[in-house]
Design a protein with these regions (language model features):
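Mobile, glycine- and charge-enriched loop segments
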Residues: 205-224, 269-277
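Domain-level recognition of nuclease-like catalytic cores that cleave nucleotide substrates
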Residues: 250-278
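Conserved RecA-like P-loop NTPase ATPase core
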Residues: 17, 46-49, 131, 160, ...
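Conserved nucleotide-binding/hydrolysis micro-motifs of P-loop NTPases
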Residues: 11-16, 163, 250-251
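Accessory nucleic acid-recognition modules appended to NTPase machines
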Residues: 55-211, 216
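Conserved beta-strand scaffold positions in the cores of enzyme catalytic domains, especially
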Residues: 4-8, 243-245, 265
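Interdomain motor-coupling "hinge/lid" segment immediately C-terminal to the ATP-binding subdomain
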Residues: 1-102
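Catalytic cores of nucleic-acid endonucleases
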Residues: 218-260
Length: 278
């Protein structure tokens, strides 16, 4: 037993998953029948994650549920001597609920206390460390000069969509932002931030001038204008070199005169498959 996740939560990338399923991408795969296979397999990968053991399970959800219980119990509760298991479980649920929102430790404390649990902020900070160490969750900081804000108000994500999906009802928008976070965090680590000063941008890598918004669908004008406007304002302020909007399946190029460059709207499966381009 022990250390399930150090072995198991280095999930397959989407490309590795396709290889595992014997789908080999050719140069022009999007124009070939392979595209249908890619889309079908992406749906599985999106909802159930990239842990190889889950791929051939009939009942994927219950396998993921039992893996989660094992990690929680063996890797965290027993290993770390957690006395308040109920609070830890509740904290994980709340992190899943708030995947897209910057969340302060103080707010987590209020939520847990509202549920009748007395818990110190230091304890919550320790629990968050345990979740990171056991590869259940990771977090990104706000891009700001305020050290306090950087340290205390973070966005929390799960290392695997399949495990996150155990906690969600109508999961699509959260799973989409989470899968983008996994990919960007793998690539940029501590250089990945979110931006939240007057305007919100889901992800930014200031040293590379990269800004990324995540929007499940861009069919409504209000959504579309909000995403573009945030990229334009923050892009000018941060001197962005590349701006992207990741969607579930929409693709287009938006010319931004204000930024003097294109904003690329990219379907998530393409974003995951072309690391060099994106």
């Amino acid at each position: 037993g022990g250390r399930y996740l150090t072995k198991e939560i280095h999930p397959f990338s989407f490309e590795e998953y396709l290889e595992y399923r014997h789908v080999h991408l050719t140069k022009f795969w999007e124009l070939s029948p392979i595209k249908n296979d890619v889309l079908r397999l992406f749906s599985d990968y999106f909802y159930y994650g990239g842990l190889s053991e889950v791929f051939n399970m009939q009942d994927k959800k219950s396998w993921l549920q039992s893996l989660y219980q094992k990690i929680l119990y063996s890797d965290i509760v027993i290993r770390k001597g957690v006395r308040n298991e109920r609070s830890l479980r509740l904290l994980i649920r709340k992190l899943a609920d708030s995947v897209m929102q910057p969340t302060a430790i103080k707010r987590l404390q209020n939520i847990l206390q509202g549920d009748g649990t007395k818990i110190a902020r230091e304890t919550i900070a320790s629990y968050l460390d345990y979740l990171h160490e056991s590869f259940l969750t990771f977090s990104i900081s706000c891009f700001t000069d305020s050290i306090t804000e950087r340290e205390t108000i973070k966005k929390h994500y799960f290392y695997d969509n399949g495990i996150l999906n155990l906690f969600l009802f109508q999961p699509e928008t959260k799973l989409l932002e989470n899968i983008v976070a996994i990919q960007l965090y793998k690539k940029y680590g501590e250089d990945l931030y979110y931006y939240n000063k007057n305007m919100e941008v889901d992800f930014c890598v200031p040293k590379d001038g990269l800004l990324v918004q995540v929007s499940y669908r861009m069919t409504e004008d209000a959504t579309r204008n909000r995403e573009i406007s945030a990229l334009q304002k923050v892009g000018k302020f941060l001197n962005a070199k590349k701006c992207m909007i990741i969607t579930y399946d929409q693709e287009e190029t938006i010319l931004s005169a204000e930024l003097g460059m294109d904003i690329e709207v990219v379907p998530v499966y393409k974003f995951l498959l072309d690391e060099e381009k994106y």
